[in-house]
Amino acid sequence: MMAGDMKPGKKVVVSEFAEDPLQAIDAHMSLQDMARPDPATLKAGEVLIAIQSASVGWVDLLMTSGQYQHMPKPPYTPGLEYSGLVAAVGAAVNPASVAVGDRVLVDGLQVGPRSLGDYQSQGGFASYAVVPDTAVHRIPSTLSFDQACCLLGNYETAYHCLIARGRLKAGETVLIHGASGSTGLAAVHLAKLVGATVIATGRSDDKLALVKAHGADHVINTRAPDGATGVRRFRDEVKLLTGGRGVEVVYDGVGGDISLESLRCVAFGARFLIVGWASTPAVAQGRGQRGAPNANVLPTNLIMMKGLDVLGCPMVIATVNDPTIRPPRFAQIMQWAADGRITPHVSHVYPLSEFKTAMRAKWNGEGS
């Protein structure tokens, strides 16, 4: 798209924090008109993006109610990760790095709701965005726009957790919870890349079939029997699959009862990776009030007796605290993508006008 081809567009706006994401979707988010961008207003190092695709992530949902640890200031446009075409560039942008017409993905750690500073309000649920050239990266030819906007957040999280923190290596077995979600599938991909055996869990046979098709060696449905609460006992299956030894690594993005049962599935000295708590999304109060009324708790007796390393894995916070950890991680992920060794899974595609349907689908676990 050239600058002269641009027309007025649309953007989604979160007007204020809600009590929970569903309330935000229903009452505090709207699709608003967006003026035709004027390339003449770009600063020297800025890039104008004609957005083609934006992913809907779990974090996007939690941010709308102020229940994520980082809270953008409303009003803002959601959409942590997005991709598009370069429509115009500022006078100081190096054409060797990015040029008009390039297919690019935008770094959600530098711009958009998860960032700090001048570009925080400009998320990807919009027709256009203006970003600094340092936040723009050419999309590998192996990926579509839809796939590209599902790359960095998912695979950087999985890399930080499994490889940097978990020290997963060839020959080990990893138990991956929430494997049918976008970050869980990325974890399956990376675990197989390093040569590990993957036991993946989920609550839907259909979704677990997809996880198996993406490389998991074994899958376990943890849904409790009809009429029962929590999760069903799966320690015996894991022990059987590991010759009675248990797994060396647990990748836990679910929390709650899954975490407790997983403590019975580990080998002595295993690494237990805390990635998230999808089973208890209201771990913080709504409307940005903080607090932890539903905090997950792990029994310290089992942690001690099994000699576990319990590791918190906040990819973004760790990167902010030590930016040097990111360049090698970023380069490796981009190289794997360019080589066709990792390909993000896209389960659903919606037009921007159906953003509420897309966000409800994510909340209800209807897609990856």
Residue ranges and their predicted role:
Residues 157, 182-183, 257-258:
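Hydrophobic/small residue at the entry helix of a nucleotide-binding pocket
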Residues 176, 192-261:
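Adenosine-nucleotide cofactor-binding segment
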Residues 37-56, 67-113, 140-143, 253:
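Glycine-rich beta-strand-centered segment in the early N-terminal region that forms part
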Residues 180, 188:
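N-terminal Rossmann NAD(P)H-binding glycine-rich loop of SDR-like oxidoreductase domains
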